[in-house]
Amino acid sequence: MIELVIVSRLLEYPDAALWQHQQEMFEAIAASKNLPKEDAHALGIFLRDLTTMDPLDAQAQYSELFDRGRATSLLLFEHVHGESRDRGQAMVDLLAQYEQHGLQLNSRELPDHLPLYLEYLAQLPQSEAVEGLKDIAPILALLSARLQQRESRYAVLFDLLLKLANTAIDSDKVAEKIADEARDDTPQALDAVWEEEQVKFFADKGCGDSAITAHQRRFAGAVAPQYLNITTGGQH
């Protein structure tokens, strides 16, 4: 599915290659056989708007959206396992899937990075690729809702993936669930996370329990992302 390759490229950090190969991407969108006309048009508008931006501005926008906080992270398992030990095993299992299909990662790539997962799905037969999208549909809906809340044009990419997945997820209900969710990308929220990481570090070094408990209490209300249980259709 060439559409998955296109979205994968658009969800990667916008480097010089995006501008160099934009015409090829426009042509691939126009040749798509899996997108209704209106969806192909929306994808083309997204690409046009992105490539008319100054590259530095596009890169800053991307980093602010996807690299600050966890709520809009493109690491899939961040929204399922958080920092639990299950995440490591899930990574190993996904990496094994990639290797079975001949996809080799370099040492800097994480297997649950959404653009990489889409690239993997694009190599599969269409029916299997659609099933792979359905597997992550609750995460896609969550990311779409959070990006819409932030009035980001990137939300259109996640809505497009949900349509390709032909999923029955109610996006309006997902939006309602996160309506009152505190943002985790504010300076205050990021500072709280940094402070918490310092506590963990000092705890590992043998600090007294009472000091750690007192410090943690200060950040008991720090922003924490909601994690999904994908076995229940994405319910929190």
From Swiss-Prot:
Protein name per Swiss-Prot or TrEMBL: Nitrate reductase molybdenum cofactor assembly chaperone NarJ
Function: Chaperone required for proper molybdenum cofactor insertion and final assembly of the membrane-bound respiratory nitrate reductase 1. Required for the insertion of the molybdenum into the apo-NarG subunit, maybe by keeping NarG in an appropriate competent-open conformation for the molybdenum cofactor insertion to occur. NarJ maintains the apoNarGH complex in a soluble state. Upon insertion of the molybdenum cofactor, NarJ seems to dissociate from the activated soluble NarGH complex, before its association with the NarI subunit on the membrane.
GO CC terms in record: cytoplasm
Gene that specifies this protein: narJ
Pfam family, one: Nitrate_red_del
Homology family: Belongs to the NarJ/NarW family.
Subunit relationships: Binds specifically to the NarG subunit of the apoenzyme complex at two distinct sites, one interfering with membrane anchoring and another being involved in molybdenum insertion.
Protein's cellular compartments: Cytoplasm
Signal peptide: none
InterPro entries registered for this protein in UniProt: DMSO/NO3_reduct_chaperone (IPR020945), NO3_reductase_chaperone_NarJ (IPR003765), TorD-like_sf (IPR036411)
Molecular-function GO terms, alphabetical: metallochaperone activity; unfolded protein binding
GO biological process: chaperone-mediated protein complex assembly; nitrate assimilation
NCBIfam families to which the protein is assigned, alphabetical: narJ
Tagged with keyword Chaperone: yes
Record keywords: Chaperone, Cytoplasm, Nitrate assimilation
Protein's UniProt keywords contain ATP-binding: no
High-level lineage: Bacteria, Pseudomonadati, Pseudomonadota, Gammaproteobacteria, Enterobacterales
